[in-house]
Amino acid sequence: MVEAQLVLPAPAKLNLMLHILGRRPDGYHELQTLFQFLDYGDELGFALRQDGVIRLQTDVPGVAHDSNLIVKAARALQKQSGCTLGMDIWLEKRLPMGGGIGGGSSDAATTLLGLNHLWQLGWDEDRLAQLGLTLGADVPVFVRGHAAFAEGVGEILTPVDPEEPWYLVLVPQVAVSTAEIFSDPLLTRDTAPIKVRPVPKGNSRNDCKAAVERRYPEVRNALNLLGKFTEAKLTGTGSCVFGAFPNKAEADKVSALLTETLTGFVAKGSNISMLHRKLQIL
């Protein structure tokens, strides 16, 4: 196996709040959400190829190759830039699929930034984020790498700096269908818009929570268990749920109690993604 020339993280994200303001004529929903990164995520390795081939390697079952966002991101950048080089890409998967913590979108953003570096394209963040948006609404925030208040379908980003607590994230063993939740007839779609600043704290609910709890008892159970120790929230459309703690020791203590029956992890909130911290020292 060829040795990776560059190894980069693909961090998780949390939606600290998610409000649905209405449905647009094109069927998409107008949102307001607050993204923050975690110092925890997938890891991608990259090695240049001279033959133009994009090849993804992973041992994780269920990760489709040609339809994977990593491959789509690489081929889109290759096409748009006219680059004739290829890339071997290795994925070490830690983030759950269908978990609402941005695994696929983060992998795509890390791919765009990694290939931009190794192919020496010189694209700026604006151009990479614009390409990222064609892959998914959450990709641009990972490309930019700063915690953000997002509007529109999630593509209008305003950098913000919320507090950076420790989080316990629980991972119910179920993949939530985002399309199913957003088509739920009982989904709240008329929340009044809020201002970007001050950073939302008190008004920080997730409008998808009730619909997810109705359809996925595993998520409801995780929220109830975590809610005995701290305010339990849903990230995105789930399935992951999370709670904030003032320090790692308290998060670890609750994790030890809950992860006997549930999968989960403890991670620090970060307003600058660990991907961008790594890129800054290259």
Curated annotation (Swiss-Prot):
Family recorded in the similarity comment: Belongs to the GHMP kinase family. IspE subfamily.
**Taxonomic classification, please?**
Bacteria, Pseudomonadati, Pseudomonadota, Gammaproteobacteria, Pseudomonadales
Q: What's its EC?
A: 2.7.1.148
Q: Name one GO molecular function term.
A: 4-(cytidine 5'-diphospho)-2-C-methyl-D-erythritol kinase activity
Active-site positions on this chain: 13, 138
Q: List residues binding ATP.
A: 96-106
Enzyme class, broadest EC rank: transferase
Q: Which UniProt keywords apply?
A: ATP-binding, Isoprene biosynthesis, Kinase, Nucleotide-binding, Transferase
Q: What does this protein do?
A: Catalyzes the phosphorylation of the position 2 hydroxy group of 4-diphosphocytidyl-2C-methyl-D-erythritol.
The protein's organism comes out as Pseudomonas syringae pv. tomato (strain ATCC BAA-871 / DC3000)
State the pathway, as annotated in the record.
Isoprenoid biosynthesis; isopentenyl diphosphate biosynthesis via DXP pathway; isopentenyl diphosphate from 1-deoxy-D-xylulose 5-phosphate: step 3/6
Q: Name one GO biological process term.
A: isopentenyl diphosphate biosynthetic process, methylerythritol 4-phosphate pathway
NCBIfam families according to UniProt: ispE (TIGR00154)
Q: Catalytic activity annotated for this protein?
A: 4-CDP-2-C-methyl-D-erythritol + ATP = 4-CDP-2-C-methyl-D-erythritol 2-phosphate + ADP + H(+)
Record protein name field: 4-diphosphocytidyl-2-C-methyl-D-erythritol kinase
Q: Which InterPro entries match?
A: GHMP_kinase_C_dom, GHMP_kinase_C_sf, GHMP_kinase_N_dom, IspE, Ribosomal_Su5_D2-typ_SF, Ribsml_uS5_D2-typ_fold_subgr
